[in-house]
Amino acid sequence: MKEPKVSVGVMFEPKIEFILNSGFICNGAEYSGLQSVKLSGGKIEWLGKVFDELIFEPADGSISSFELKDVTIGINFHWERKENQLFKGSLKFIVEGEKITAINLLGVEEYLTSVISSEMSATASLELLKAHAVISRSWLLAQIDKNIEITNSSEKYSTMTESEGELIRWYDREDHTRFDICADDHCQRYQGITRASTPIVMDAIGQTRGELLMSEGKICDARYSKSCGGVFEEFQYCWEDKKYPYLVKQRDSKSDTIIPDLTVEKNAVEWIKESPESFCNTTDNKVLSQVLNNYDQETVNFYRWSVKYSQKELSQLILKRSGTDYGDILDLVPIERGTSGRLVKLKIVGTKRTRIIGKELEIRRTLSESHLYSSAFYVEKEMGSEQAPIAFTLKGAGWGHGVGLCQIGAAVMGEKGYNYKEILLHYFIGATINKMY
């Protein structure tokens, strides 16, 4: 197996400015310096001409780089912002809908160097970085294989089921059909060579080159999130109804392995109220700074957290985020939970409408201006003199979907002396680590 190439959708705008910092070849001629493309009649306008697509390939791949202006990072998250970003590899422009898409084409190992630097602090321990390199590589190649399967399947792939009383939707990277993955947290956080790559990041990539997590002869769909909250979630509760043997419930601990049945409401509430021992139950800034870049460190409470909304705030928020007018909110009723206590289905009861929503990310998006930390929460209502509650407090556990590697837990394991293979096999139960190229 040779090192694969990857295509990454970086930005989507009607007009894109970019700088070719050295010579790039396009349509047989060499260009450099400040350039601009814009949408014109469904095509790409550049230098007074229109094109269906454009590809800029580096004249000297070892030193060539390009810069994209005003790239949005953290799309729909609480720290969303724009920044200029620097990239190696080739640059491709295509038209999708009413926007131009900028795509970066490069080798998997070069891509991983950026992902590790973007997702993690470059000051993270070597073992944590090596574990993340194997996970990111595995996830990427598994998604490419999955996309090929979906493309070749006669069955239509759907990420949503909807009826009058229920909306169940999950979010995955399959809505990218013209490139492999996007550059934001929706897939893996990728910011080219904008973030500094230290020698330790390069070592982590090099020492694990070509290594993949495998299970039953296939590359593992190696998911990860910031904090599981103490128990791993299972794949089918967050995405399509498919079980993977390596993504199953387990305590994020070696000393305490007892797991209450968190699909039972009473048990889930008690679990969230507690703060049990787990690898990811830490407030150690040295450890947290390994996983959380500066903008992630704006989030302080993640293992256990709470959010309070007034009736007006919650009803307006749900209307804004879902597009559905429920009227005043009377109740938020848990219908189904996964193995970590995360809500899979939630009933929103309003004076105008009642509906069940899911899965976990749909719930998180509906109940927050960006993304609620997780769907592992219970609700406390504050009643007034009227029929509808005057306030709702959501008390929750963890940060993210909780499936696969828990980044903060893995950082703690690295600090405790576990090597990268031990870290990986703690979070991906029964998997193996194979060198494939």
Positions of predicted regions on the chain:
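Conserved, single-site charged/polar hotspot
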Residues: 1-437
